[in-house]
Amino acid sequence: MGAANSKDSPYYNWYSFTNYPDKYECWWGFENLPNVNENHHDYTEYITGKDGVISYWHNMGASGWRLDVADELPDEFIEALYKRAKETNKDSFIIGEVWEDATNKFAYGVRRKYLLGGQMDSVMNYPFRTAILDFVKSKNSRLFEDRIFEILENYPPQVTACLMNSISTHDTERALTFFGVQNNVQPEDYGKYILSQEEYQRGKNGLLLATFLQYTLPGLPSVYYGDEAGQNGFKDPYCRKTYPYGKEDFEILDFYKSLGKIRNEFKEDFCLGFTPIENRDGFFSFKRGKLICVINLSEEPRDVNVPGTVIFEHGNISKDNTNLISNPNSAMIITSK
């Protein structure tokens, strides 16, 4: 028997009714999303108890959990969930949706302790998303480096290693649309707006350069379905269109596959630090293990004087005697000798 059917329901005390049974506290005013009291003993036990939801799905093969809107979950509940997940499977992975720097986050007047141990293994990396998209659009490599190091300096290395790096999500405008559409489209037109060929190509160019950074920066690239096939879309809910079956952009798809192959082949290198080499007017190069990653968003060709073998290239890469030349809007990965 449900809580709205009877006050004798075992679930009644999980909710806060203001005018039973029709009015109750709900998430951001959405009546189909009633708030639950996560710290009510019966509810906490239902989710995190020995025979609760967490244990059930782990025993069915689930390997981890993403905590949606972590700011609105009490510390005590997150800690109980984390503890049960690790007791059920020590390798269970808990990741939280946190949009800001998770080490100094205040939510509802409370300083959160997501990364102090016992709550989360890592978080969604929205700060990197902002840094990447802004860099590709503005070409400001100095600001980009500052933003990256702000996170790297604050986060524990074990958290950084498994950050969820996305450039599009179910809550944001898709990267291709972000780069492609430059005019001010009104929200009421989001659903019917069709990108022109020029807008699509501009968006595609930006998407590929942003994806290069997504795959080469510290953390784990997390692809929002459809980005790898050329899907576009404005903010939620228009970013949630289905995968474009039969209409994939195979040039984009091959680009993602190539970067994914390199991530798999050089796993150890992508776990080894992040060392900037050169940062100048939209040109940025950095080292990951024995790999040198180079992106040139400037208006000028730049010499890349690094001995080694190019294992990935995008855009116009050329040679001048012994030097590689990174032309505008290009990127490459080199295995150094």
Predicted regions and their residues:
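The substrate-binding groove and active-site-proximal loops of carbohydrate-active enzymes
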Residues: 30-45, 62-72, 131-139, 191-202, ...
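Active-site-proximal helices and loops of the catalytic beta/alpha 8
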Residues: 53-55, 63-64, 68-163, 213, ...
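Short, solvent-exposed loop/turn segments at secondary-structure junctions
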Residues: 58, 63, 71-74, 99-102, ...
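Substrate-binding/active-site clefts of carbohydrate-active enzymes
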Residues: 1-60, 81, 87
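Aromatic-anchored helix/helix-loop segment that forms the rim or "lid"
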Residues: 145, 149-151, 183-208, 265
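Aromatic/acidic polysaccharide-binding cleft in carbohydrate-active enzymes
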Residues: 109, 121-122, 164-195, 211-250
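Short beta-strand segments
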Residues: 65-68, 95-97, 165-168, 224-225, ...
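Carbohydrate-interacting/catalytic domains
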Residues: 203-204, 216-223, 227-337
